[in-house]
Amino acid sequence: MSNEVKKNEELIEKLVSVKRHSKTVKGGRIMSFAALTVVGDGKGRIGVGRGKSREVPAAIQKAMENAKKNMVSVNLNNDTLWYPVMSNHGASKVFMQPASAGTGIIAGGAMRSVFEAVGVHNVLAKTYGSTNPANVVRATIAGLAKIKSPDEIAEKRGLSVEEIQG
């Protein structure tokens, strides 16, 4: 469970977790490995991927390729969020709120990898319920994906940004 950081084609690749699986057959146990990775460009694009193979490096490679195929765009306010947001996936619930410059990433485990890959540098975050890395990563990305900028909200409501921000 290391956090490997690699810059490849301007993408930040993070390994979130590696788990060992076993299948019991007549002749014994067959081991395989499952990897969970996060890929981002540091500018608001993020993807999550899973890969499974008999060897760890092959599982990680498959997960990285899968993450690159499943990238989504996130709306950020420079290096933080626009407003507090709560999201869940399965039994995992995550709460994220913007932080002032210099605060850093105050988040645990799998959430930290997502924030580093997407390009968020100042955020306060907390996980409630299950801390299963797969569910926490998906909940974090879902929460980030539903954030809208004041410009988008104003356009949707047919108002000016000043009227919305009061």
Curated annotation (Swiss-Prot):
Claim: Ribosomal protein is one of the keywords in the record: yes
Gene3D superfamilies reported in the protein's UniProt record: 3.30.160.20, 3.30.230.10
GO CC terms in record: small ribosomal subunit
GO terms for MF: rRNA binding; structural constituent of ribosome
One of the GO biological process terms: translation
UniProt domain S5 DRBM: residue ranges: 11-74
InterPro entries: Ribosomal_Su5_D2-typ_SF, Ribosomal_uS5, Ribosomal_uS5_bac-type, Ribosomal_uS5_C, Ribosomal_uS5_N, Ribosomal_uS5_N_CS, Ribsml_uS5_D2-typ_fold_subgr
The keyword rRNA-binding belongs to this UniProt entry's keyword annotation: yes
Function as written in the Swiss-Prot or TrEMBL entry: With S4 and S12 plays an important role in translational accuracy. Located at the back of the 30S subunit body where it stabilizes the conformation of the head with respect to the body.
Quaternary structure (record): Part of the 30S ribosomal subunit. Contacts proteins S4 and S8.
Domain notes: The N-terminal domain interacts with the head of the 30S subunit; the C-terminal domain interacts with the body and contacts protein S4. The interaction surface between S4 and S5 is involved in control of translational fidelity.
NCBIfam families: rpsE_bact
Family the entry assigns: Belongs to the universal ribosomal protein uS5 family.
Name this polypeptide is given: Small ribosomal subunit protein uS5
Native source species: Francisella tularensis subsp. tularensis (strain SCHU S4 / Schu 4)
